[in-house]
Amino acid sequence: MDASCLFKALLATNWALFLWDQYITFRQYKAHKNAVKRPNEVKELIGEEDYKKARDYKIDNHLFGFFHSWFNQLLLTAQLIGGYYPFLWYATASYPLHVAVFLSINSIIETIIDLPWDLYSTFIIEDAHGFNKQTIGFYFVDKIKKMLVGFALTMPIVYGIEWIIVNGGPYFFVYIWLFVSVVVLLLMTIYPTFIAPLFDKYFPLPDGDLKTKIEQLAASLSYPLTELYVVNGSKRSAHSNAYMYGFWKNKRIVLYDTLLSGAEKEKVHELYVAAGEKIEETENDKKRGMNNDEVVAVLGHELGHWALWHTLINLVITEVNLFFSFAVFGYFYKWEALYQGFGYHDTPPVIGMMLIFQFVLALYNQLASIGMVIHSRSAEFGADEFAANLGHGENLIGALTKLGVDNLSMPINDSLYSWCTHTHPPVVERVAAVRAFQAKNK
């Protein structure tokens, strides 16, 4: 295949995948648009007022998403046809640290182009629906900080990969895979301790009923919990979350303050005020959050992922995917027609990696993503069942219901869209599965 035909074929594939994404997203939009009345099957999960709020939020995000995605797709097409990337690559060729200069300038340009969209999403949509907690000053400081940290982390990795390509011999892709795998594990280890605190303040969860119950849950499962933190997620957004991290005998749990309610939230906020943090809560914010038993049920679900080896399985799947992707890169990275089709007159490895990962592997990435969604949904049901088996079924149902309401999750979904994109099954399906498990084990 000559260079011109190859370029057209890869661009056509890119457009086909984009249109597929637009098709299933439009199906989801129509499902939400047409669901004006609250269906009977979700009435016990969400009230009439909350249902209307969730529907309005989703429709606003859908409409914004359509315009944003079409803008990005048309911009990318114009950049590819117009030769923007080759122009920037060769225009920066005379600078020391060519790759770093190219990637940095491109990243800054992309950030500036996307800035109006991100500002609209944050300060118009999220703000209108009660989620945004950022000031404009905090927003820009946070974005600049993230960009600088991203540069500091990315550039050594890129240069390490480039050095391996040049010096690694015929099996360089194996060494790249090993190098990237080690870097990923290292970042997973150091990120929560050294990088995340650059953006948010983490405090030990105050002593009390919640801490005692979480420690008892961890001990009952022989989970090697060493630290239990709470983070002030409410300074950015009202969305709630919790996660675990760590290796071997050094496991830690982090709760967002938005997950908590009542006295537990008040104790946490007292910590933040004492540390100089500003806490502002609306009446809606005060209504959000879970009771202690529901938080414990959520962590029972998260510990289910650990006990059922889901974390390790996901890591193995990620490693297999990385190895395959780098093997494909190793096979195609000197394919001159690929570079020529996109406007390059030599074969720079960094450009080759960008082209192969974004365009040559595009269809594979789409199929792999759907496969991971299917696997993830199965794991979520398994973790829910694990928590229910511990006796937290009813509290888990309460927690899932509150998570859905607090985050304005729409309980109605298009089946195809959900099957292709929802790594976590809809709340309706999860609640039904927990109840079916409870009925089976009475």
UniProtKB/Swiss-Prot annotation:
Segments crossing the lipid bilayer: 63-83, 85-105, 147-167, 171-191, 312-332, 350-370
Topology with respect to the bilayer: Multi-pass membrane protein
InterPro entries for the chain: CAXX_Prtase_1, Peptidase_M48, Peptidase_M48_N
Cytoplasmic side: 84, 168-170, 333-349
Lumenal-side segments: 1-62, 106-146, 192-311, 371-442
Subcellular location(s) per record: Endoplasmic reticulum membrane; Membrane
Pfam family, one: Peptidase_M48_N
GO BP terms, alphabetized: CAAX-box protein processing
Function according to Swiss-Prot or TrEMBL: Proteolytically removes the C-terminal three residues of farnesylated proteins.
Official protein name in the record: CAAX prenyl protease 1 homolog
Lineage: Eukaryota, Metazoa, Ecdysozoa, Nematoda, Chromadorea
